[in-house]
Amino acid sequence: MSPGGKFDFDDGGCYVGGWEAGRAHGYGVCTGPGAQGEYSGCWAHGFESLGVFTGPGGHSYQGHWQQGKREGLGVERKSRWTYRGEWLGGLKGRSGVWESVSGLRYAGLWKDGFQDGYGTETYSDGGTYQGQWQAGKRHGYGVRQSVPYHQAALLRSPRRTSLDSGHSDPPTPPPPLPLPGDEGGSPASGSRGGFVLAGPGDADGASSRKRTPAAGGFFRRSLLLSGLRAGGRRSSLGSKRGSLRSEVSSEVGSTGPPGSEASGPPAAAPPALIEGSATEVYAGEWRADRRSGFGVSQRSNGLRYEGEWLGNRRHGYGRTTRPDGSREEGKYKRNRLVHGGRVRSLLPLALRRGKVKEKVDRAVEGARRAVSAARQRQEIAAARAADALLKAVAASSVAEKAVEAARMAKLIAQDLQPMLEAPGRRPRQDSEGSDTEPLDEDSPGVYENGLTPSEGSPELPSSPASSRQPWRPPACRSPLPPGGDQGPFSSPKAWPEEWGGAGAQAEELAGYEAEDEAGMQGPGPRDGSPLLGGCSDSSGSLREEEGEDEEPLPPLRAPAGTEPEPIAMLVLRGSSSRGPDAGCLTEELGEPAATERPAQPGAANPLVVGAVALLDLSLAFLFSQLLT
């Protein structure tokens, strides 16, 4: 199990959980300032790995993380929609399924958080679009299939002719119930999702009749022209045939070819109601979420248009076929047929009609090619949608694991919280992330990025503890309690050779130093120095963990005028196979480190001590010879 603790951010955030090598590692919980936002789950070397993030507004993410960003499989939930699938660089990417509470759903490819590539979108009323996408909008070739007219969503604005794509589309209210005896509904009461063709009595036709009281065109709005033409209804080629007439006017006024003259004012046709079971499908080009380019739209009752489109309207050259089999063709402008505009040349009418016919044929041929391309893209989009559904299922499974990891992290945080309530100064960091106060309590050096760590944390002054060691607070304590019988140099192996060896010689040296202790006593070493077995990081020595008592060593001093030599010790902590005596080892370093303490001026010189010990041994040897 990884060691654990608590880390307080300067902005008020907090992390409680495990860490390793100065970074968040294992299970942990990280909260933002004022407990706004929380991540709980697994951590890996300072970054989120698998867990649950809950935002201030209640939205959540459950899944994989990498380098502080959402990466892999995951589920994001907000108040009005849910996304399940793959993530790339913190954004929705590759493949996934997006669903809204209104019933709108997209399944397919994603890029940079938007629908991009191939996918299938199902609208709130049940209609579908299958085809290409770009930057979250329908763009390229695709097929839009509507539901029966009485089930189609009622658009809020009469000017709208299509449902918008993507999660930006708000929920559409259900369509009103039809009146008794009316299976469908009048198009004038509002547009329906997926229905864009305007036939006799449709919305565009009704509005055009209101704007054009007479069927002869906008020239008849003038009272002066009406008076001049009161004697005869037939107009000249330069006036009558050059007028702008609406689509409904041409359809109602005559059953002949476009541009034919009417023998009298046309009779007002009753509004044609769309059957409740009628459906409509469009296959062709899309640009910026609208029908634009070449395409074909066909209704189940036989109404059909082939040609050019712009902004969900017939615009350009095309051909319209009515349910009764009659046709009209020519140039359309904003969903209305234009009969060549005002004639400003003396070209024969037959020659002019021939040029229009040629352009119409080219437009119809382009529309049919667009239908073929759209059908191919439709099949690809269906396959990508099936793959996205599989990714969504896998993401849901990962989300369940993330929830379990979050539960474990919260349990561990609750267990660690009482242990961390002991008083003590906590480390604070300046703007550059360096410690400005002494470390009295171990802290996980995690990376701060908003609510969660994102970059490297400041390392502790000493080498990190081994993964096999249990956690210990970094407060440096002396391992030499009163009354102890062992010290860091209690083993004979730890004595330097120039100090006289081991055994009885060491006892004689200790007795000799004890006699002069009062006069040779110098300033003792500082807390945390290697001589006292102190430590500068969170892990203690093996002796400290076992609670063994150690005997303090007498201080050493050097005679006046001699240069003190620094003594460097590296304390290696951790379990050892050579027994408790090997708990603290010493190693001479080439250069003095930050934790090295040079000998004090009042300490004894090791050379002098060695010389005195050698003299004492010589005297003892001579005395023994005299006795023998």
Swiss-Prot record:
Pfam families: MORN. Residues 432-443 have a biased composition (Acidic residues). Residues 158-214, 231-276, 415-602 are annotated as: Disordered. The keyword Transmembrane applies. Residues 1-606 are cytoplasmic. One of its GO terms (biological process) is calcium ion transport into cytosol. Residues 170-179 have a biased composition (Pro residues). InterPro entries: Junctophilin, MORN. MORN repeats lie at residues 50-72, 74-95, 96-117, 118-140, 141-163, 164-186, 317-339, 340-362. Keywords: Cell membrane, Endoplasmic reticulum, Membrane, Repeat, Transmembrane, Transmembrane helix. The chain crosses the membrane at residues 607-628. The keyword Disulfide bond does not apply. Residues 231-241, 253-272, 453-467, 528-541 have a biased composition (Low complexity). Belongs to the junctophilin family. Junctophilins contribute to the formation of junctional membrane complexes (JMCs) which link the plasma membrane with the endoplasmic or sarcoplasmic reticulum in excitable cells. Provides a structural foundation for functional cross-talk between the cell surface and intracellular calcium release channels. JPH4 is brain-specific and appears to have an active role in certain neurons involved in motor coordination and memory. This is Junctophilin-4. It comes from Homo sapiens.
